[in-house]
Design a protein with these regions (language model features):
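Thiamine diphosphate
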Residues: 5-11, 19, 71-72, 76-232
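Residue-level recognition of hydrophobic positions within alpha-helical transmembrane segments
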Residues: 27, 65, 163-164
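Domain-wide signal for the mature, well-folded portions of proteins, strongly enriched
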Residues: 34, 65, 181-185
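Acidic-histidine catalytic/liganding microenvironments
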Residues: 37, 61-62, 132, 160
């Protein structure tokens, strides 16, 4: 457009997500509407990635980016020193990716990929799967949603019986379908079953707490989808 590359170090912060009773106009997950825009990177805040260094890194690239901030994280502390709780640990050995695990990061029945906004639900599902079903899980939390850093994750994905991608948005043209397509393209011959996608119900989001929980993805939604896939 300009005959040369123009630096544009711009980050647009975008609060997203439900679970706070804000109703249909302040609870949406908008990530999927920006997937595939040329030159636009998408990031999401998580309790594993320090926002300061991450934002500096994004700005240093000189390209536009969106930084999605799930409002449920605003009042939570970051995890530090590789410890989540008495059951779970995490590592950041893969740049930009947190791996949360109870036993070993490289060997699990299920790999659960989830953005930062639903980390708590993903870990609660992983805990329930391990204690009640003896299904081990590794939760993958990327800081960059798009373009998704698939290559360094291929070894752990290749070993899993089930790969599940969970997100709070409604189904259809989502970040999860984009990542699943990439995984299928790379690992289809090695996979035991297609990627399992878990989303919120296709509905406006109620303000009432009990109705909101019925619409939005919960840890039980994730758990049941993984158990069903393994039993199929």
């Amino acid at each position: 457009m300009y005959g040369r590359r123009v630096s544009m170090p711009v980050v647009v912060r975008c609060p997203v997500g439900g679970g706070r009773g804000y109703g249909p106009t302040h609870s949406q997950s908008l990530q999927k509407h920006f997937i595939g825009v040329p030159g636009l990177s998408l990031y999401e805040m998580s309790p594993f990635h320090d926002n300061g260094p991450l934002l500096r890194e994004i700005l240093m690239r000189g390209e536009p980016a969106m930084f999605f901030e799930d409002k449920s994280l605003y009042g939570r502390r970051m995890f530090t020193d590789g410890v989540v709780d008495k059951m779970f640990s995490y590592d950041l050995t893969i740049p930009g990716v947190a791996r949360v695990f109870a036993e070993q990061a490289d060997a699990a029945d299920c790999v659960l990929i989830a953005p930062g906004g639903i980390v708590q639900k993903a870990m609660k599902a992983a805990r329930s799967l391990l204690l009640e079903e003896e299904i081990s899980s590794v939760v993958i939390v990327p800081s960059c949603l798009y373009p998704f850093p698939l290559e360094p994750l291929l070894p752990i994905l290749r070993q899993a019986e089930v790969i599940c991608i969970a997100e709070e948005s409604t189904a259809g043209g989502t970040w999860g379908t984009e990542v699943a397509q990439q995984i299928h393209q790379e690992l289809w011959d090695a996979m035991q079953r297609p990627v399992v996608l878990v989303n919120s119900d296709s509905s406006v989001i109620p303000a009432s707490e009990h109705l909101e929980k019925q619409v939005l993805i919960q840890h039980t939604t994730i758990r049941e989808a993984i158990v069903e896939a393994l039993r199929a």
